[in-house]
Amino acid sequence: MSLITGLFKDQNSAETAYKSATDMGYSSDEINVVMSEDTRKKYYGKDATLETEVGNKAAEGAAIGGALGGTMGAIAAAIAAVGTSLVLPGLGLVIAGPLAAAIAGAGAGGVTAGIVGALIGWGIPEDRLKDYEQGIHDGGILIGVKARSDDDARRFENDWKQNSADHVTA
């Protein structure tokens, strides 16, 4: 499985990329989304006000995310799903998807190291982390998916590049 990541400059391009993954049969549990808290507020404001704490695994979150999915963007629904997202106010980040579970496992004391370790463990080269960190700081949205096949990986890479993604890594 190849990890495909891309940094999207705006909500529309990120939503289109997220939708392309779900249209290919990937679930929100397989799609990672990382953005700043300011970006979440800017693009998803009142629709994504449900905040989670590190390690909070409330089961009802999945139902909330699914119920909200029809009334707002797919990314906002993923953020709202308590069981699959983290809001890290001290770092100003919002993380949704399997990466959130990996970071939650680090516990509150290891969150900062957990994020860096999880991103590296996720397969993002260390030299690319700086590009993503700056892009997220500047309001971008990072999306990543572990492609199930080489064909899926090529499709993600092509679709995301055509959809204004920066720093697409396969």
Question: What are the residue ranges of the model-derived segments?
Answer:
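Cytosol/matrix-facing juxtamembrane amphipathic
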Residues: S2-G55, A106-A170
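Small-residue-rich hydrophobic membrane-insertion segments
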Residues: E53-D131
